[in-house]
C-alpha cells in the first residue's frame, strides 16, 4: 500500500 507520484499526475500504487 505505497503510493508514489511522478511528474504530472502519474500515480503508481503498490499494495
Curated annotation (Swiss-Prot):
It is found in: Cell membrane. Transmembrane segments: none annotated. GO terms for biological process: adaptive immune response. One of its GO terms (cellular component) is T cell receptor complex. Its main location: membrane. It comes from the Eukaryota. Keywords: Adaptive immunity, Cell membrane, Immunity, Membrane, Receptor, T cell receptor. Alpha-beta TR is a heterodimer composed of an alpha and beta chain; disulfide-linked. The alpha-beta TR is associated with the transmembrane signaling CD3 coreceptor proteins to form the TR-CD3 (TcR or TCR). The assembly of alpha-beta TR heterodimers with CD3 occurs in the endoplasmic reticulum where a single alpha-beta TR heterodimer associates with one CD3D-CD3E heterodimer, one CD3G-CD3E heterodimer and one CD247 homodimer forming a stable octameric structure. CD3D-CD3E and CD3G-CD3E heterodimers preferentially associate with TR alpha and TR beta chains, respectively. J region of the variable domain of T cell receptor (TR) beta chain that participates in the antigen recognition. Alpha-beta T cell receptors are antigen specific receptors which are essential to the immune response and are present on the cell surface of T lymphocytes. Recognize peptide-major histocompatibility (MH) (pMH) complexes that are displayed by antigen presenting cells (APC), a prerequisite for efficient T cell adaptive immunity against pathogens. This is T cell receptor beta joining 1-1.
